[in-house]
């Protein structure tokens, strides 16, 4: 469970722990990870939780995380790609990628691929990726994915990263056909979390103005929990909202863009053969 120290991720991790799952909680701050693990153990009888730390702004750290997970756990039944970020000003990751593309798409793309063999060996298994309805305003400019030649628009860049989540899920599901591993993604709703805290003044204002109509993290986690654990989920490659499969924006059904994004992502993350 990535990005599980607060908000939707924490609520999802706690719900799954209360259902009896062994939950591995990821965060970028060791103190926060430890605190959440202790709090979940206190709130959930016989909860089996532990933590791992990695910075998704560094692909080297993502690779280290994948090795640590594989070393510590013989089985991996569910991978929830929840970690995400928003920023209103352009800045690079440690690898030089646009911040939101790097953390919201390339990091989970790499982590998922590095853990695929463990997931296949644990089949039936599930991959759940948190996207957003914001993908509807996203445009993937393959000639300028890092926003080096355009005026930066943080919300559009966020939307592009969430569109990438859906395209990634679609191609991943196709590649996993017959493996016993499913891949689905979701819109959690507009949730009252701290995701806008690192988005600059403009982003924080957007978050504050929208907070009155936002869902609680527990409510926002419902679709993630459903896709991770419900026996009713028997599909793959779908986009969910409120625990139901729905049609994403037309751009999310672009087969050529789906294939191209996969190829580009393989190259950028060093997975290309």
Positions of PLM-derived features:
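C-terminal helical subdomain
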Residues: 161, 185, 207-248, 253-259, ...
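A glycine/serine/threonine-rich, flexible loop-to-helix segment
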Residues: 143-145, 192-210
């Amino acid at each position: 469970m990535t990005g599980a120290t607060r908000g939707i991720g924490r609520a999802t991790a706690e719900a799954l722990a209360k259902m009896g799952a062994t939950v591995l909680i990821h965060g970028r701050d060791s103190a926060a990870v430890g605190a959440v693990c202790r709090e979940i153990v206190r709130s959930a009888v016989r909860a089996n939780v532990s933590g791992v730390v990695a910075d998704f702004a560094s692909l080297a750290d993502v690779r280290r995380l994948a090795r640590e997970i594989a070393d510590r756990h013989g089985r991996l039944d569910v991978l929830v790609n929840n970690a995400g970020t928003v920023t209103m000003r352009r800045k690079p990751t440690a690898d030089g990628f646009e911040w939101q593309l790097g953390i919201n798409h390339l990091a989970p793309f790499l982590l998922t691929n590095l853990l695929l063999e463990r997931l296949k060996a644990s089949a039936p298994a599930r991959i759940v990726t948190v996207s957003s309805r914001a993908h509807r305003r996203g445009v993937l400019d393959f000639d300028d994915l890092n926003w080096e030649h355009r005026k930066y628009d943080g919300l559009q860049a966020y939307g592009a990263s969430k569109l990438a989540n859906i395209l990634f899920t679609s191609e991943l599901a196709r590649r996993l056909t017959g493996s016993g591993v499913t891949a689905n993604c979701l819109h959690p709703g507009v949730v009252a979390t701290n995701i806008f805290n690192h988005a600059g003044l403009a982003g924080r204002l957007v978050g504050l103005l929208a907070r009155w109509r936002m869902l609680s993290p527990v409510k926002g986690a419902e679709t993630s929990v459903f896709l991770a654990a419900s026996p009713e989920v028997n599909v793959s490659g779908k986009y969910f909202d409120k625990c139901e499969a729905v049609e994403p924006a037309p751009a999310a059904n672009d087969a050529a863009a789906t294939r191209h994004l996969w190829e580009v992502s393989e190259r950028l993350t060093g997975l290309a053969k």
